[in-house]
Amino acid sequence: KTLLLTLVVVTILCLDLGYTTKCYITPDVKSETCPDGENICYTKTWCDVWCGSRGRRVDLGCAATCPIVKPGVNINCCSTDNCNPFPKRS
């Protein structure tokens, strides 16, 4: 019985029991729990016509895989809770 109990405890500790990642999400830039299967946080930045005066556009969110982006769009992906804060303007 002790061996069986030990195996059950080890199994529970080794399994990811429904853990979901938390990421910052735009437009509110608040931390939210990602949907099941989306364990990647991303920060996507790009320039639009107002880039010179307003700075780069920023999109924050969750994804199942790191999004593929077009030329001129920067993407940073990470996989820990709230690892995608709104970038500081330089």
Curated annotation (Swiss-Prot):
Top-rank taxon, per record: Eukaryota
Cysteine pairs bridged by disulfides in the record: 23-41, 34-62, 47-51, 66-77, 78-83
Pfam family, one: Toxin_cobra-type
InterPro entries: Snake_3FTx, Snake_toxin-like_sf, Snake_toxin_con_site, Toxin_cobra-type
Keywords from the UniProt entry: Acetylcholine receptor inhibiting toxin, Disulfide bond, Ion channel impairing toxin, Neurotoxin, Postsynaptic neurotoxin, Secreted, Signal, Toxin
GO CC entries: extracellular region
Tissue spec. comment: Expressed by the venom gland.
Localization: Secreted
Predominant subcellular localization, coarse grouping: secreted
Molecular functions per Gene Ontology: acetylcholine receptor inhibitor activity; ion channel regulator activity; toxin activity
Leader sequence residues: 1-20
SUPFAM superfamilies per record: Snake toxin-like (SSF57302)
Function: Binds with high affinity to muscular (alpha-1/CHRNA1) and neuronal (alpha-7/CHRNA7) nicotinic acetylcholine receptor (nAChR) and inhibits acetylcholine from binding to the receptor, thereby impairing neuromuscular and neuronal transmission.
Family stated for the protein in its record: Belongs to the three-finger toxin family. Long-chain subfamily. Type II alpha-neurotoxin sub-subfamily.
Stated name of the protein: Long neurotoxin OH-34
Source organism of the structure: Ophiophagus hannah
